[in-house]
Curated annotation (Swiss-Prot):
GO cellular component terms attached to this protein's record: cytosol
Catalytic activity: 5-amino-6-(5-phospho-D-ribitylamino)uracil + H2O = 5-amino-6-(D-ribitylamino)uracil + phosphate
Pathway: Cofactor biosynthesis; riboflavin biosynthesis; 5-amino-6-(D-ribitylamino)uracil from GTP: step 4/4
Calcium among keywords: no
Cofactors that this protein relies on: Mg(2+)
Keywords tagged on the record: Hydrolase, Magnesium, Metal-binding, Riboflavin biosynthesis
Entry EC number(s): 3.1.3.104
GO BP: any one term: riboflavin biosynthetic process
Name assigned to this protein: 5-amino-6-(5-phospho-D-ribitylamino)uracil phosphatase YitU
Active site per database record: 11 (nucleophile)
Enzyme category, top tier: hydrolase
CDD domains on file: HAD_Pase
Amino acid sequence: METKPYLIALDLDGTLLKDDKTISENTLHTIQRLKDDGHYVCISTGRPYRSSSMYYQQMELTTPIVNFNGAFVHHPQDDSWGRYHTSLPLDVVKQLVDISESYNVHNVLAEVIDDVYFHYHDEHLIDAFNMNTTNVTVGDLRENLGEDVTSVLIHAKEEDVPAIRSYLSDVHAEVIDHRRWAAPWHVIEIIKSGMNKAVGLQKISDYYGVPRERIIAFGDEDNDLEMLEFAGCGVAMGNGIDAVKQIANRTTATNEEDGVARFLKEYFSL
């Protein structure tokens, strides 16, 4: 058994979670054994905290968490740890709304940590994003937003996504980073330039004094690339995109096949 503690970073969707958005009993049991052995387990996700807290609680974690792909990092159980919030300037957000309107997009959402602003009313999106328990404001973002935001989501027509992303790269490359969500959502997610999961993971590893060679990170999508590269052992899911598998040190089974648990059991001889 390993005696020095490892830091194990888990993406949620397509990685830790099965397709039905649950954690298998096998995976829960494996994570508990690693925690009992003194290892640190953390979540590193593109989701906001409000839609990842249930998994944090289910796994009974006691570590900081990375949300919004690194734009928000905090410790849910220790306010003194600090809150690292890297936001998008409000003037840039207003420009993003302008360009979105010119493409007649379905909607634009702005998130300020756990408050959500919709440019247009959209019951379907509110339900899909599980926002019924969230502070939701509907109306022109240029009027309703009074502070810098954590992230912007542009829900566009599929055929317009490449053109909008090209514009973002041409005009705002120094200020923002943008990614396209996996199907079926034709959503462009925008955060402050330079933010990624590795930035958040480094804050956590520094806090615990765990060197990179004792960090294991799991992921499946392009927002996991930097984190897998940062970790001493980056593990791609079997269902991951090719770019993730190419950059990873190892590839495990799919999220439906308990890929996380299978790798960890083998690695730590559980």
